[in-house]
Amino acid sequence: MQKKGANISLKGYDDIFSTEQSRAEAQQERVQEIPLSELHPFEGHPFRVVDDEEMMKTAESVRDFGVLTPAIVRPDPDGGYEIVSGHRRHRASELAGKETMPAIVRDLDDDAAIILMVDANLQRESILPSERAFAYNMKLHAIKHQGQRTDTRFTGPIVIAQ
């Protein structure tokens, strides 16, 4: 009869001697300066980024003050980062001659990234109705794909049947 070895799993030194606080800090999202060359647009991004007068004002602001609100990006398996929220800030940074841009890196699956991207962009006022409709359609498909609703708020009109 062959003797089986014990299946022992030992934690590393850092796991044993780190504090709850240091482990929590390691899990927190941080703003990072990411080179613009490592950032690329979200595949299927339904909103146009146009070099219009408003974009030139944004680029001037970025040149003078930097990007005030970090973009949200996710790691791309092929390298670099995919922009989930911040396409206009990215373009303004390019026009302003910047080399890096502040961003928060999040691990998001496709559905979560689509929902976040749509929600972040629908807050803007200058969206074409066709872009808005396409974005809502993307969000609907992402929510259906997840198999559940991601929020409990109802934002439509309330109709009471009698």
For every predicted segment, state its role.
Residues 1-106, 113-125:
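Short, charged/polar connector segments at secondary-structure boundaries
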Residues 98-107, 133-141:
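Short, surface-exposed, charge-dense and proline/glycine-enriched linear segments
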Residues 123-162:
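Alpha-helical interaction elements
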Residues 52-55, 87, 111, 130-133, ...:
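Amphipathic alpha-helical transducer elements in NTP-driven molecular machines
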